[in-house]
Swiss-Prot record:
The keyword Protein biosynthesis applies. It holds the Pfam family GTP_EFTU. Belongs to the TRAFAC class translation factor GTPase superfamily. Classic translation factor GTPase family. EF-Tu/EF-1A subfamily. Residues 70-74 are annotated as: G2. It is found in: Cytoplasm. This is Elongation factor 1-alpha. Residues 5-232 form the tr-type G domain. This protein promotes the GTP-dependent binding of aminoacyl-tRNA to the A-site of ribosomes during protein biosynthesis. Residues 14-21 are annotated as: G1.
Amino acid sequence: MGKEKPHINLVVIGHVVAGKSTTTGHLIYACGGIDKRTIERFEEGGQRIGKGSFKYAWVLAKMKAERERGITIDISLWKFETRKDFFTIIDAPGHRDFIKNMITGTSQADVAILVIASGAGEFEAGYSKNGQTREHALLANTLGVKQMIVCCNKMDDKSVNYSEARYKEIKNEMTSFLTKVGYAKVEERIPFIPISGFNGDNMIEHSANMPWYKGPTLLEALDNVHPPKRPVDKPLRLPLQDVYKIGGIGTVPVGRVETGVLKPGMTVTFAPVNVSTEVKSVEMHHESIPQALPGDNVGFNVNNVSVEDIHRGNVCGDAKNDPPCKTESDAQVIVMNHPSGIRPGYCPVVDCHTAHIACKFEKIMSEMDKRTGKVLRENPDIVKNGKSMMAQLVPSKPMCVETFSDYPPLGRFAVRDMRQTVAVGIIKSTVRAK
């Protein structure tokens, strides 16, 4: 039966100390993703190092540490199931490259849980100009995560004491902010749930501590999420993650189908190298499959192409149906974290799908209002943090990207410099590069 449930990708966002790990750990545990014995083992370890109060966060931290040390962990720990759906937590902001991952993402998130600390001064810190609450909410909307659930966490904090007035204050602030960022009909579409990620209030069952709250629990809100429509009817786009040479078989490119369908017998084109060939076979989890659909990570065997011809960052498409090609693009870019600001001529690295290529801001056409897209200045000489621009990007070597409106996963990117994400953007239009 289980196979019939829709799969939904979930991302958990919010300021550093909002309690994301505790909330996520508790949720996975409550939905049966982690057995009690594991929690108890972690809890003992936590108490030994004086962290007993972090038992659910400790679960995620331990999993993360084990992942970082290369110990394989049961990936089911990052999955849980509700009455209606299977959920996979695709990333949590504790990761160093969280913003880059969220953009170039191994997966597009279908829904975001925004965790907010309700404690006195804590909400204000996360919501301040330098806090991550704003940045993450803006990012989620820019990257097309249209469904959101807001958790007002730490309602059990002494400074809050399950206060309805504090909940309303935070809800009002955040409703107007999310509307500014670009979320529509926030009041109707985004649930605000007062919770305690540690004690479990309003996570699975309604809390006796907050009889004034009549809305859904976190679990009920997750069950109300609409499963995404996977784009099978679009032309094929498959960015390559790796290309292997396998003895006795030949060249095997590997990647995730983003749109369309990949089948044996198809003629495919790789961009920007403009190499075409026939697909001999398609495999997933070491088994031959008749077709690969969006979301599938696959390896496929191709005729007469060597590992020197195609590389990570190339894009595979259907030679007969809108094949991909090398492109230059105009993009809307939001500057997030640049020490001085971005000027024409700036040449950072752009991470778009699996491609990682230096691109020059050839021309900055305008500075715009982030939310409305209204032009504020034509041809600015510099665009600073928090501002949005329309820019012409020219890659230093051939690159294949697509417009965000046609192929979202190939149309959103991170701008990286000084080992951090300095800006994010979406491709508005492309032209075939000469």
